Amino acid sequence: MHRLILVSILVCANFCCYRDTFATPQSASIKALRNANLRRDESNHLTDLYRRDENIRVTGTGHVQSPRFPNSYPRNLLLTWRLHSQEKTRIQLAFDHQFGLEEAENDICRYDFVEVEDVSESSTVVRGRWCGHKEIPPRITSRTNQIKITFQSDDYFVAKPGFKIYYSFVEDFQPEAASEINWESVTSSFSGVSYHSPSVMDSTLTADALDKAIAEFDTVEDLLKYFNPASWQDDLENLYMDTPRYRGRSYHERKSKVDLDRLNDDVKRYSCTPRNHSVNLREELKLTNAVFFPRCLLVQRCGGNCGCGTLNWKSCTCSSGKTVKKYHEVLKFEPGHFKRRGKAKNMALVDIQLDHHERCDCICSSRPPR
């Protein structure tokens, strides 16, 4: 009797100890991962997300950084630095070349990231959010005398070295230009054509006129010279100093001056180009008494438009500048009865000629073909 009771106790104890092993592999792995990543203090007690909000008065140079930089930062952090400088100054941020956080998911920084926001009395604007290791964030200058930096890490993966941001203030603050732009008449000459360069005094230049003028320029330098001949070099330097105010989810990567020039050149080079076009063979060859297999073929034909690369684009058409004929082998059928055996006289492999456009030109009525 005592042996039977002892056996029952052993069976029950063994079953109770291992009943958790019947959980699904997925739930077991998730549970183990979460338990392994719970934040604990020095006494091994579980703690919540660590939060800290710090105000910094910017009177010179300094820096903020992720904890333990340049080593791996801790998990479960939410740190905020609010930087303030004196009136009529701005704050400039520069990231250390050592930068690395947890990688993005589908190009979105969801988990570990550092974020910079412009702060004013009326609004808060996100200047950028960064993570991963591929890109060192660019230099940032605040729009006002306040800026906010936020660092967040979740309870899973961490990375190193983290980040370090150097801050300083910029003197001689000038308010941003008003939304209503005026224009000052300044004459400059490009390609023998005179234009009025926009500044801040004359309100006669319309958007259509400005758009037409911009079509003349091939480089960013020429465009900025047109806007402000006296200060275009400073404008060029400042143009690539600040990041955009808002980055959408589909943001690609910041373009340099060379990239912008290349994009503009690509538009002019490829807007009117030969491209694949499918043609119906009966319609193309104007044959009504035959059919072909395949019914359609791909040929190179001019396509696109001239609207972004030339002046007076409304009078321009994209036309072939060089046409060649190429042979294609197809199966041709002619109406009639088909024999089930033997050679059918009304079916044969034939060579046909189709026009292919090798070069395309923008033909404008206001000027001869280029």
UniProtKB/Swiss-Prot annotation:
Tissues with expression: Widely expressed. Expressed at high levels in the kidney, adrenal glands, eye and CNS. In the kidney the localization is confined to arterial and arteriolar vascular smooth muscle cells and is also detected at low levels in the glomeruli In the eye in the anterior segment it is localized to the iris and ciliary body. In the retina localizes intensely to the outer plexiform layer, which contains photoreceptor axons and the synaptic layer between photoreceptors and second order neurons. In the spinal cord, prominently expressed in the motorneurons.
Glycosylation, residue list: N276
GO molecular function, one term: growth factor activity
Post-translational modification summary for this protein: Activated by proteolytic cleavage. Proteolytic removal of the N-terminal CUB domain releasing the core domain is necessary for unmasking the receptor-binding epitopes of the core domain. Cleavage after Arg-247 or Arg-249 by urokinase plasminogen activator gives rise to the active form.
Subcellular location, record wording: Secreted
Keyword Signal: yes
Protein's recorded name: Platelet-derived growth factor D
Organism of derivation: Rattus norvegicus (Rat)
Classification lineage: Eukaryota, Metazoa, Chordata, Craniata, Vertebrata
Encoding gene, per UniProt annotation: Pdgfd
